[in-house]
């Protein structure tokens, strides 16, 4: 309802003020909300939207392409929040070893939205051997930014194993990254990120 929306906005603005975070309300009366989101993203550090609303409430006729469009046009990082609030204490970082995946870690560490969290960096592999220093380097980078971190190598596909692994390890947030190349992003989003968004009951931090 409109009343509920106004209360939520007021509470959000009050919380931002308490944390000394700049917050302003912008209203756009137009049929294409994505045009407004893309425009405003140029001058903001983080974009937040409901994890399921983009799929469940007719926000767009093609959610898959909409999320791809947001990320390829520069709306990132994105925090996709779940329906139910949960304190963020344990963060699971899905790390592929790619430059894009490393950038996602860097964006999260630099933004530092939850300073007291512990980090769990996981790499999913499908039989191939990875460099032994892959997770070691990622862990050292996180530790250099003052975070407590542990690492784990898991056999299997990220698409089918990421969410079960996150739940088993009591993660409160998942950090993921993808390439900005549109063709590659469409393939990767279809394989992992979109599948995760559609199925997740955890908030997601999505970055380049």
For each feature predicted by the language model, list its residue ranges:
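Structural beta-alpha unit
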Residues: 3-47, 144-174, 179-188, 194, ...
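A generic secondary-structure signal
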Residues: 14-15, 80, 107-111, 141, ...
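Intrinsically disordered or low-complexity boundary/linker segments at protein termini
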Residues: 37-40, 45-115, 120-122, 199-208
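Acidic, proline/glycine-rich short linear motifs
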Residues: 1-3, 119-143
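Short, small-residue-enriched loops and turns at beta-alpha junctions
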Residues: 55-57, 126-131, 182-183
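Charged helix-capping and loop-helix junction motifs
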Residues: 62-66, 134, 188-193
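A general structural motif
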Residues: 99-106, 129-134, 157
């Amino acid at each position: 309802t409109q009343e509920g929306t106004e209360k939520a906005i007021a509470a959000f603005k009050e919380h931002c003020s308490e944390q000394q975070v700049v917050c302003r309300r912008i209203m756009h009366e137009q049929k294409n909300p994505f045009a407004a989101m893309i425009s405003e993203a140029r001058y903001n550090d983080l974009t937040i939207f409901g994890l399921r609303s983009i799929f469940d409430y007719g926000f767009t006729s093609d959610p898959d392409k909409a999320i791809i469009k947001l990320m390829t046009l520069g709306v990132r990082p994105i925090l996709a929040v779940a329906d139910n609030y949960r304190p963020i204490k344990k963060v699971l970082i899905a790390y592929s070893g790619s430059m894009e995946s490393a950038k996602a870690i860097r964006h999260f560490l630099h933004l530092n939205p939850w300073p007291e969290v512990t980090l769990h960096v996981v790499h999913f592999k499908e039989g191939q051997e990875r460099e032994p220093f892959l997770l070691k380097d990622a862990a050292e980078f996180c530790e250099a930014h003052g975070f407590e971190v542990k690492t784990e190598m898991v056999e299997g596909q990220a698409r089918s194993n990421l969410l079960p692994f996150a739940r088993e390890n009591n993660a409160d947030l998942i950090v993921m990254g993808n390439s900005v190349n549109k063709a590659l992003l469409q393939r990767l989003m279809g394989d992992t990120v979109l599948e995760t968004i559609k199925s997740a009951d955890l908030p997601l931090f999505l970055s380049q």
